[in-house]
C-alpha cells in the first residue's frame, strides 16, 4: 500500500509542476505513484508508508558512503551551529579545493558553484572566453544539465547544427552547439574539418551516465584529446557522475587522460547542493576577479555544503575503499546477468566502480546511444515495478544509471539477487527470448 505517498503526490500537484522538483521523480517514465521518502540510512530508504527499500539510486549519485553517514552528519551539524550561509569565504572552501586537486591533479584551481548544471554551463563560458570561439561539441545521449546551449538533440547528420530538445530554448542559442556520435571519432573529426576555427571546446562524459551507462572507448577519448590539441580547442570532462565514484581520481584517472577543464558535482557535496569546475591554472585564472570571464553565486561555497563535502572526500581515502566498492558492484551486476541468462531474459549491462546500467536487449554489448534507446522500455517498466514491490528502489527511468554505496553489504546485494531470481522465474512470457 502506498496510500500516504499517493495522497502527498496528489497534494503536491496542486503546488508544484507535476508534483515534483525534478521531472524524473514523478515516475512519468514508468507509471505509478512516486514514493515520498521520510528517512534514509545506510543503503536503505523508508517511505511515508513505512516501507523499506534497498536503495540503488543514492540520490542520483552523491551518496557514495550511503545515507546519513555519521562523519558527514557530524560535519554538517557542526557547520550548522556556526551559521547556514555567510556570503563570504570560509576555510573549508580551501580545504575542499585542495583535496579535489590532490585527488584530480588536472584540477590546478577550482571554482565552487551550486549544481552540476552551473558547473558545465560555467566551464563552457570559460572555454569560450579563453579561446575567443563560440561553438562547442557535445554528444548525442550525453546529459550535461539543463543550460539552454546543452538541451540539444542531434541534427539530421553529423555536420548539422543541433536542434532544441525543450520548448523555451531559442534556436539561436543552440546553433553554436554541434552534436556528434558518442564513441565515433570520425563524427568529431568531420566537425573539426568544417568548423576548426570556431570550436571552443568538446564537452563529454568519459562514462556516459544518462543513456543508461556507456563507457567511452579508450581510443575515442585519446582521439578527442588529440583533436583538441591539434585545433586549439579545450577538452572538458563532465565528471559530475563519475568524479570520485569510479575511482578516487575520477574517470580521467582510469583512462589516463588529462582534460583542460572538469565539471564536478554530487559526491563533492556529500548530499548537499553543490557543483564545481576546475582545470589548468592559466585557464582558471581567466575567471573574475582575476580575469575577464564573469561567474558568481550567492550560495557558492556554502559552509554546510563544504563541510559535508570535505567529510565525504576524506572517507574515500580509507584503505581498499574503491576495491571493495568495485567488488560489490561486480557481484551485483554479474549476479543479475547470470540470473537473466538462466531465465532467458534479454538483458545486458555495463558497469564501473559503484555505478551500473541495465538494458533489456539481446545485444551483447551496448556502446552507442542508438543501441541504448532501442532497449525494451516496456520490459524495464515491468521489472522496475516488480523490484519496487519487493523493496528494491531503482531509478524510475530505463536510461538512468544505478548506484551502489559503501554502505551496501553482501547481505543487501544477495537479497537483491534473490528477488531478481524470483522475478525472472515468474516473469511473463514477453520478457523471455528463445534459446
From Swiss-Prot:
Pathway this chain belongs to: Porphyrin-containing compound metabolism; protoporphyrin-IX biosynthesis; 5-aminolevulinate from L-glutamyl-tRNA(Glu): step 2/2
What protein am I looking at? Glutamate-1-semialdehyde 2,1-aminomutase
Cofactor(s) required, per the database record:
pyridoxal 5'-phosphate
Which leading EC class covers this enzyme? isomerase
This protein's record includes keyword Isomerase: yes
Highest taxon listed in the record's lineage: Bacteria
**Compartment list:** Cytoplasm
Q: Which GO terms describe its molecular function?
A: glutamate-1-semialdehyde 2,1-aminomutase activity; pyridoxal phosphate binding; transaminase activity
Organism the protein comes from: Coxiella burnetii (strain Dugway 5J108-111)
* InterPro entries, per the entry: 4pyrrol_synth_GluAld_NH2Trfase (IPR004639), Aminotrans_3 (IPR005814), Aminotrans_3_PPA_site (IPR049704), PyrdxlP-dep_Trfase (IPR015424), PyrdxlP-dep_Trfase_major (IPR015421), PyrdxlP-dep_Trfase_small (IPR015422)
Q: How does it assemble?
A: Homodimer.
Coiled-coil regions listed in the entry:
none
Which family does the similarity line name? Belongs to the class-III pyridoxal-phosphate-dependent aminotransferase family. HemL subfamily.
Listed A to Z, the keywords are:
Cytoplasm, Isomerase, Porphyrin biosynthesis, Pyridoxal phosphate
Kindly indicate whether the keyword Isomerase belongs to this entry: yes
Please list the GO biological process terms of this entry: protoporphyrinogen IX biosynthetic process
Question: What NCBIfam families has UniProt attached to this entry?
Answer: hemL, PRK00062.1
Question: Which SUPFAM superfamilies has this protein been placed in?
Answer: PLP-dependent transferases (SSF53383)
Q: Which residues carry this modification: N6-(pyridoxal phosphate)lysine?
A: 266
Please give the GO cellular component terms listed in this UniProt entry: cytoplasm
The reaction(s) annotated as catalysed by this protein in its Swiss-Prot or TrEMBL entry are: (S)-4-amino-5-oxopentanoate = 5-aminolevulinate
Could you say which EC number(s) this protein's record lists? Answer: 5.4.3.8
Amino acid at each position: 500500500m502506498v496510500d500516504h505517498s499517493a495522497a502527498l503526490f496528489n497534494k503536491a500537484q496542486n503546488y508544484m509542476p507535476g508534483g515534483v522538483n525534478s521531472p524524473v521523480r514523478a515516475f512519468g517514465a514508468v507509471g505509478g505513484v512516486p514514493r515520498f521518502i521520510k528517512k534514509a540510512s545506510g543503503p536503505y530508504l523508508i517511505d511515508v508508508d513505512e516501507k523499506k527499500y534497498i536503495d540503488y539510486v543514492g540520490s542520483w549519485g552523491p551518496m557514495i558512503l550511503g545515507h546519513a553517514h555519521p562523519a558527514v552528519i557530524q560535519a554538517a551539524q557542526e557547520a550548522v551551529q556556526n551559521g547556514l550561509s555567510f556570503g563570504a569565504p570560509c576555510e573549508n572552501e580551501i580545504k575542499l579545493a585542495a583535496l579535489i586537486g590532490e585527488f584530480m591533479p588536472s584540477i590546478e584551481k577550482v571554482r565552487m558553484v551550486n549544481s552540476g548544471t552551473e558547473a558545465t554551463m560555467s566551464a563552457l563560458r570559460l572555454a569560450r572566453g579563453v579561446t575567443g570561439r563560440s561553438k562547442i561539441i557535445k554528444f548525442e545521449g550525453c546529459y550535461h544539465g539543463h543550460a539552454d546551449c546543452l538541451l540539444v538533440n542531434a541534427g539530421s547528420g553529423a555536420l548539422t547544427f543541433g536542434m532544441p530538445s525543450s520548448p523555451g530554448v531559442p534556436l539561436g542559442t543552440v546553433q553554436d552547439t554541434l552534436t556528434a556520435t558518442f564513441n565515433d571519432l570520425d563524427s568529431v573529426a568531420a566537425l573539426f574539418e568544417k568548423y576548426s576555427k570556431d570550436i571552443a571546446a568538446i564537452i563529454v562524459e568519459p562514462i556516459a551516465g544518462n543513456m543508461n551507462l556507456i563507457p567511452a572507448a579508450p581510443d575515442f577519448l585519446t582521439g578527442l584529446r588529440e583533436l583538441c590539441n591539434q585545433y586549439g580547442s579545450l577538452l572538458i570532462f563532465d565528471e559530475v557522475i563519475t568524479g570520485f565514484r569510479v575511482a578516487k581520481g575520477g574517470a580521467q584517472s582510469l583512462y589516463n587522460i588529462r582534460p583542460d577543464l572538469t565539471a564536478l558535482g554530487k559526491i563533492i557535496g556529500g548530499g548537499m547542493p553543490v557543483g564545481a569546475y576546475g582545470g589548468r591554472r592559466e585557464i582558471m585564472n581567466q575567471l573574475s576577479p582575476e580575469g575577464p570571464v564573469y561567474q558568481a553565486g550567492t550560495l557558492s561555497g556554502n559552509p554546510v555544503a563544504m563541510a559535508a563535502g570535505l567529510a565525504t572526500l576524506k572517507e574515500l581515502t580509507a584503505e581498499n575503499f574503491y576495491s571493495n566498492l568495485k567488488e560489490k558492484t561486480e557481484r551485483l551486476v554479474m549476479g543479475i546477468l547470470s540470473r537473466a541468462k538462466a531465465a532467458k531474459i534479454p538483458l545486458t549491462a555495463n558497469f564501473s566502480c559503484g555505478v551500473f546500467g541495465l538494458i533489456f536487449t539481446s545485444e551483447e554489448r551496448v556502446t552507442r546511444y542508438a543501441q541504448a534507446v532501442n532497449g525494451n522500455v516496456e520490459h524495464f517498466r515491468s521489472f522496475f515495478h516488480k523490484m519496487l514491490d519487493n523493496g528494491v528502489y531503482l531509478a524510475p527511468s530505463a536510461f538512468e544509471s544505478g548506484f551502489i554505496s559503501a554502505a551496501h553489504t553482501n547481505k543487501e546485494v544477495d537479497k537483491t539477487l534473490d528477488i531478481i531470481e524470483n522475478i525472472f522465474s515468474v516473469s511473463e512470457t514477453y520478457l523471455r527470448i528463445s534459446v
